[in-house]
Amino acid sequence: MRFYNRYNSSLKNYLLCSINSFNTNTLKIPLKPTLSAVFNTFRGERSLKFIKLYLMILYISNQKPFIKKVKFSYIKKKILKRFFISVSLNKKNSFNFFMYMLNFYNYFFHIYYQKCLKYNRFENSLILYIDNIQFFFKNYNKQNQKTQIKCQLNLRNSQASILFKYLNNMFLIKVKN
């Protein structure tokens, strides 16, 4: 339990370090971000610690997410195997969201298999993917702990390229295969 508390506080401190620098809306883009993730749980996991951790990270970044969908997948109706969560983010704090993404990316950079942020573009939306995040806990299991976080940003046609340039300065981005 002590490890879990230390992990939470270090993550909180890291994400809070310069959260206000994106409060000014320099791009003038009314973003409508939707964030979704699929988490594989630990072997034998029966609680929903990851939902709490995931939402805590969003609250720290001042997003106050609205949960759209939570879906669970069980093994033999008892052991939680994975869950899917989808949230709508606060439009007023859209640039806090970019700071959240940047800090989250930097924090977990050393445990990525692909050290980049992947993206796809569909009509008026830009979809970003962070793949293969590994979380460090006591019973860390490398094979069971891969996850993907997907962020969808709905934009007007002309704004997708501006946003892409902006994000490209923050992350190493490549097209998802």
From Swiss-Prot:
GO CC terms in record: mitochondrion; ribonucleoprotein complex; ribosome
Annotated localization: Mitochondrion
Family: Belongs to the universal ribosomal protein uL5 family.
Plastid as UniProt keyword: no
UniProt keyword list: Mitochondrion, Ribonucleoprotein, Ribosomal protein
Annotated coiled-coil segments of the chain: none
Protein name as annotated: Large ribosomal subunit protein uL5m
Gene: RPL5
